[in-house]
């Protein structure tokens, strides 16, 4: 997933000899991080404490934790600004659930705070094997579209796990809706969902032009330079 991807990206940047990235962890529910986060939301807000004290469910606790942390996020921006001349990259690891970060008030505060001070790019990490089926691919593209629409920032679409499932066909589907339609026909699915996917492929054609798709593998390290150059 995304945390493994950030671990690989962090290791790749260290190996290249660039200045170590400044990593900010904004996932309050993660148990262990395989990298050193310079700023960690878990040091300020207890995810499980919120669940117990306020009777919240998992997603509610994550949203509340991010919202609370966002009230003092100017301090994080100040830390990054002080190190700006020394840093090449600031990497922010957010909660994986799109709805609890991208569409939360706290998530908006964080995104806008970074975008107002730094050149900011959103990375949407999609699972390449999970996108192998046309309808699953379309579901992922709709999610990416919603994130791009909300953030209004440049986006890199990283198809992860290409060592297990090459992303070449996914790029073909993005480049030519007729190829995507042929894949839908070959699947034999005549459901309403398949018909909707067919229509959406036409609607999203312009959206694809605003994405920078790359294939990566967090497991074996493929595509990291392509990702950084996207």
Role assignments for model-derived ranges:
Residues 4-121:
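Nucleotide-state-sensitive switch-loop elements of NTP-binding domains
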Residues 1:
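Conserved glycine(s) of the Walker
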Residues 112-230:
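Conserved GTP-binding G-domain of TRAFAC-class P-loop NTPases and closely related GTPase folds
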């Amino acid at each position: 997933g995304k945390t493994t991807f950030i671990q690989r990206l962090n290791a790749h940047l260290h190996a290249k000899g660039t200045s170590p990235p400044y990593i900010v962890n904004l996932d309050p529910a993660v148990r262990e991080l395989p990298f050193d986060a310079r700023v960690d939301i878990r040091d300020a807000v207890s995810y499980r404490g919120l669940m117990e004290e306020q009777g919240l469910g998992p997603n509610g606790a994550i949203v509340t934790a991010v919202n609370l942390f966002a009230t003092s996020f100017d301090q994080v921006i100040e830390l990054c600004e002080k190190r700006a001349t020394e840093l090449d990259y600031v990497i922010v690891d957010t909660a994986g659930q799109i709805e609890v970060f991208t569409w939360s008030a706290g998530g908006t505060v964080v995104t806008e705070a970074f975008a107002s001070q730094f050149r900011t790019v959103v990375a949407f990490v999609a699972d390449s094997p999970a996108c192998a089926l046309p309808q699953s691919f379309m579901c992922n593209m709709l999610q990416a579209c919603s994130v791009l629409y909300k953030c209004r920032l440049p986006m890199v679409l990283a198809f992860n796990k290409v060592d297990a499932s090459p992303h070449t066909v996914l790029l073909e589907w993005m480049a030519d809706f007729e190829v995507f339609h042929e894949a839908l026909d070959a699947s034999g699915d005549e459901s309403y969902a398949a018909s909707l996917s067919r229509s959406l492929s036409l609607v999203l054609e312009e959206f694809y032009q605003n994405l920078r798709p790359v294939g990566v593998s967090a497991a074996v390290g493929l595509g990291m330079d392509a990702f950084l150059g996207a």
